[in-house]
C-alpha cells in the first residue's frame, strides 16, 4: 500500500483491478486525474482507468519508481454518470489515507504495520474523545 501521507501523482499511470459484474478479475489502465475531490463530505480521487459496477472494493495500483514495486493507491468505489449514462473512464476511488484511518479505527492497524494491542489494552473511541 502507498505509504501514509503520500498521494499518487497527477498523470501517473494507474491500474484498476476488480471483478466487475461478477466476471473474473480484470485489469484496466489509466491515469490519475484528480488527487482529491470531496463528494457528499467524503474524500475521493479520480482516475481514468475504466471501472464498472462490481469493481468497487477492488484496488487501484501504481508503480513506485522509488520503492520498485506496485502499490495500492486507492479503493475503487464509484463510477461517474452523466445524463443517466455511466462514464466508466471516470472512476472515483477512496484514497489510501482513508484506508489507514479505517483500519486503525476498527482495531486493525496491525495490517499496516502498527503494533498489535490485545483488546484489554486498547482505548475505545469514546476514551479518545475524552482526552
Where do the PLM segments sit?
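Active-site-proximal beta-strand/loop segments in catalytic clefts of secreted hydrolases
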Residues: 17-20, 49-50, 75-79
Amino acid at each position: 500500500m502507498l505509504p501514509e501521507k503520500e498521494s499518487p501523482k497527477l498523470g501517473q499511470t494507474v491500474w484498476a483491478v476488480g471483478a466487475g459484474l461478477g466476471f473474473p478479475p480484470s485489469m484496466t489502465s489509466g491515469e490519475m486525474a484528480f488527487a482529491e475531490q470531496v463528494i457528499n463530505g467524503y474524500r475521493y480521487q479520480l482516475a481514468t482507468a475504466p471501472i464498472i459496477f462490481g469493481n468497487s472494493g477492488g484496488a487501484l495500483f501504481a508503480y513506485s519508481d522509488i520503492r520498485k514495486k506496485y502499490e495500492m493507491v486507492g479503493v475503487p468505489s464509484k463510477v461517474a454518470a452523466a445524463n443517466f449514462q455511466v462514464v466508466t473512464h471516470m472512476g472515483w476511488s477512496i484514497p489510501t489515507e482513508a484506508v489507514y484511518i479505517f483500519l486503525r479505527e476498527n482495531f486493525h492497524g496491525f495490517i499496516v504495520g502498527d503494533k498489535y494491542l490485545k483488546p484489554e489494552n486498547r482505548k475505545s473511541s469514546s476514551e479518545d474523545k475524552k482526552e
